[in-house]
């Protein structure tokens, strides 16, 4: 059986074709707003799907300060909560520490994004 290779040409074309849909979707429009948005959302999603706790402080430690400031990270988190994509809860190990997770809507939106993204890649 021959191994299929990624068709860069067709994949790039599909990325461009998908722009309109991504901008129309509230979640992906927010996800792609900036590199910092992408980083924060991916870190919260990783914590959610891999079942570990991640706090604002953890996120700040993982993201280079050249990508975004603590204030910008905090603002993205606040917007994520307001949009219903994130929830903030007390840590299981320390009630003073607040941790972030994707809400049910956030999990659904993120999963739908990944499924659509997977279809973008063309192998021949």
PLM regions and their residue ranges:
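Short, cationic-aromatic polyanion-contact patches
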Residues: 91-114
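Phosphate-/nucleic-acid-contacting segments
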Residues: 59, 66-69, 91-96
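A short, conserved structural fragment
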Residues: 81-91
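Short alpha-helical segments that sit at the start of domains
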Residues: 13-45
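An acidic intrinsically disordered interaction segment
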Residues: 1-14, 109
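Short amphipathic alpha-helical interaction segments
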Residues: 66-82
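Amphipathic alpha-helical dimerization/coiled-coil segments
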Residues: 111-124
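Short acidic, hydrophobic short linear motifs in intrinsically disordered regions
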Residues: 50-63
């Amino acid at each position: 059986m021959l191994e299929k290779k990624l068709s860069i040409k067709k994949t790039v074309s599909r990325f461009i074709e998908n722009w309109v849909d991504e901008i129309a979707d509230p979640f992906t429009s927010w996800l792609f707003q900036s590199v910092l948005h992408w980083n924060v959302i991916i870190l919260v999603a990783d914590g959610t799907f891999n079942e570990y706790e991640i706090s604002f402080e953890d996120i700040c430690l993982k993201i280079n300060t050249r990508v975004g400031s603590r204030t910008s990270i905090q603002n993205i988190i606040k917007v994520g909560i307001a949009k219903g994509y994130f929830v903030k809860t007390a840590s299981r190990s320390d009630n003073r520490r607040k941790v972030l997770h994707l809400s049910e809507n956030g999990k659904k939106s993120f999963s739908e994004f990944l499924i659509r993204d997977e279809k973008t890649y063309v192998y021949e």
